[in-house]
Every structure is written in structure tokens, then in C-alpha cells.
Amino acid sequence: MPQTSVVFSSILGPSCSGQVQPGMGERGGGAGGGSGDLIFQDGHLISGSLEALMEHLVPTVDYYPDRTYIFTFLLSSRVFMPPHDLLARVGQICVEQKQQLEAGPEKAKLKSFSAKIVQLLKEWTEAFPYDFQDEKAMAELKAITHRVTQCDEENGTVKKAIAQMTQSLLLSLAARSQLQELREKLRPPAVDKGPILKTKPPAAQKDILGVCCDPLVLAQQLTHIELDRVSSIYPEDLMQIVSHMDSLDNHRCRGDLTKTYSLEAYDNWFNCLSMLVATEVCRVVKKKHRTRMLEFFIDVARECFNIGNFNSMMAIISGMNLSPVARLKKTWSKVKTAKFDVLEHHMDPSSNFCNYRTALQGATQRSQMANSSREKIVIPVFNLFVKDIYFLHKIHTNHLPNGHINFKKFWEISRQIHEFMTWTQVECPFEKDKKIQSYLLTAPIYSEEALFVASFESEGPENHMEKDSWKTLRTTLLNRA
């Protein structure tokens, strides 16, 4: 019988290559009698009915599913059913197999069967602990573990493994809950309304150059923040992009849809960094100092690129391309823009960001062959990554004409998500500077209105449209005051 796909072999290593390992065996009875509902192509599973795919997940006496399949199916199944329903079906299949073993000649293999079920549950709870945060899932988990414990009442090996698994699960759930509570307490940077009339900033007011004047150091601290923020994103958060869009397409609201707080927080960080860059430039009074500020951020963006921190690089470029900054022609005329032009070339949106994708591929290859943590860093442009997942979902159907689930599609989505998760687990090798990070995370940022006011005060409006905008803004802010 053909085996599960090899898509993750380069990521998970030889022990998880997608091929049956010694002692793993094949799915007994042709995938539990459901092999006719599983379609393989060149040895790769490409489609199947939901029932057959669920049966393919559950071990037998002589079969254990490949880890790549476990991860992919557990991740993608939530598009079709909530985790507690899948867990309930897994429990039913376990009961059926247990009864067959008890009634047949292989009763002695019950202990081996129960150990494999516990191993499957262990992998599930480790990969997706949040699946067990609701009472329904916990009840199903307890029901399954109670049944398999009965298969090894003599020496209690299975019972001990279940106890360890449960303890680890509870610790993971507690840690995630505490992290989310902490994130929700942290306020975003204060929004500064900016000057209402032209005034010089207070002498004591700091800018980024007063905190850090080394582009490399600032790029390293930005990388620290990126890795810290992205580490709170989990595979199921990313798969919600798919399931949420299905809900919208079908005009229904998923009541069990978990808040994608981590995704929103990470997206907000990108926007805050862009606005901080624009604020730092626009609030500088002297043109010479604004020029220096722009050149500094260009150097920071270049260092981010060299590190592999494409998300911060894109945020910085986006900040410098905001209208209040981009319109400062007199300032830009003094800037040595050759390095900025190179950065914009890397982020050129033409041909679906072809240049960026080439650079990302190079960083990925460097990461795979890396000998140090520094070489392993890959932080993609998150908005583009999300769009890739979204479009991959939109251009390929969930179901084929014969009613099968298009599992080939979910292999690819899962592969991309797994690769992203690998990048998020890299330990940042740079020394942490609390002073710099505090400034980056808490420095007041101008609102869009305030940015335009500061920009116009630095370089007056040059055409009728700008003059009208400037007049309207001044009137609005004065009335508001």
C-alpha cells in the first residue's frame, strides 16, 4: 500500500520522512476497510473522504500514522469539524478496534495498541494544546484515556504515560492563557496628536537617535521584538485564516471561532513600527537632521535585510513611503538614496513580489544549512505570508467533484505553516537592550493627521491639493483643541 506524502522530510528529518519506519507497519485491513476512499498518486496521499482520513489517523496493532500526516490532518481537519468532534470520532474508532482485538486471536496485543493510541494523543496535545481548552474536548480525552488504561491494568505503564501527557497539557494551556492575559494588558504605543501650531519640540524630548545611533544594534533589537511577537502565533491561528474565510463565504458565523489575538497583535506591531518611523522623521524640525534620520532608517532597514528580518524591513520602508514622509522633497533631495533604491528593488511588488521571494528563498536555504542561531533567522513579511495562505486556499477547492477532500491542497498549506513555525522557534542570538526595546514599544507615535501637520510645517504645501489639505487639517485640529 502506498504511504503518506514526503512533503516534510527536509524539515522533520529522516525519522519522519513520510515513509513507513520499521515497526510502524501499514494500516491494517487497508486503512481500516476505508482504503477505497483514500487516493494516492506516486505514493502520496492526495485525496480521501473525511471518514477515511479520520481512520487513517488512528493507529492499529501493526500501523502508526506518519508524523507529517498527523500534523497535516489535525491542522486541516478544523476546517471541516471542531477538534472535539474529531476527538469523539477517534474515540469511537478506538472502541471498535479494542472490541475487535478482545474478541479475536490478537487479544495479547491490546497493550501495544493502547500504547500507540496514547502516543497519538501525546502528539496531538503537544502540537495543538489549545484544542483541549474547552470542556467537550477534555471530556473526550478523558473518555479515550480511560478506555486505553483498561488495556494495561497490570503494570500501569500506559496509565503513567497518560498522567505525564495530561500534566504537560495542563502546563501548556496555563502558559498560553497567562501569555494572552499579559499581551492584553500591554497597551500599544500612545498616539500623539502632534503639534497644533508650529513649535519646537522640548529640548528634553528624545528621538530614536538619542537612544540608539547604531543601525545594526537597532536592527538586532527589532529582530528581538519580532521573534518575541511571532512566537505567540500557533499553527491553528494561521489555519483560522482558512476556516474563517469559509465561514464568511458560507454566510455563517462560527460560534467556536477562537479570537486570533496573536495575529492581530503581530499585524498591529507592523503598523506601529511604520508609524514610528514616519513620526521620527516628520517631527524633526531641521532639514539636516531629517536627512540624517532618513539615512539612519535606510541603514536600519538594510541591516534587517542582512539579518533575514524582512518584516521589520518592510515596515520601515512602508513608513518612509507614507505620504507625509514621501512628500518631503527638499529633505529627500539631500538623502543618498542609492541604498534605499536597492531596498525598494527587493520589495518591488511587481510579479507578485518576485525579488522579495528570491531573497526569502536565499534566507531559507541559509537557515537550513546554518551552523549558528544568527544564520537561522528568517522573519518573512507577515502580511504577504498570510496572503499566500489565503490565495492558496481560494484557488484550490476543499472538495473534489467526487466529494473527496482535496488533501493535496492541505499538504501544501500545512507545509507552508510548518515552515513558518520552524522560523518562529529560532532563539534570538543578539543581546537584549531593554532601553532600546522600551523606546521602540512605548514611544508616542503621531496620528495620520498629526503626521501631515508636522510634514506641512516642515515643508509647506506645493500645490492646490496640498494647500487645501493643509488648511482643512489646521481648522480641524484648532477646533478640536
UniProtKB/Swiss-Prot annotation:
Keywords: Guanine-nucleotide releasing factor. GO terms for molecular function: guanyl-nucleotide exchange factor activity. The keyword Oxidoreductase does not apply. Residues 41-170 form the N-terminal Ras-GEF domain. Detected in brain and spinal cord. Highly expressed in a number of intrahepatic cholangiocarcinoma tissue biopsies. GO terms for cellular component: cytosol; plasma membrane. It comes from the Eukaryota. GO terms for biological process: cell migration; positive regulation of Ras protein signal transduction; Ras protein signal transduction. Gene3D superfamilies: Ras guanine-nucleotide exchange factors catalytic domain, Son of sevenless (SoS) protein Chain: S domain 1. Residues 214-461 form the Ras-GEF domain. PANTHER family: GUANINE NUCLEOTIDE EXCHANGE FACTOR, RAS-GEF DOMAIN-CONTAINING FAMILY MEMBER 1A. Guanine nucleotide exchange factor (GEF) with specificity for RAP2A, KRAS, HRAS, and NRAS (in vitro). Plays a role in cell migration. This is Ras-GEF domain-containing family member 1A. It comes from Homo sapiens. The gene is RASGEF1A.
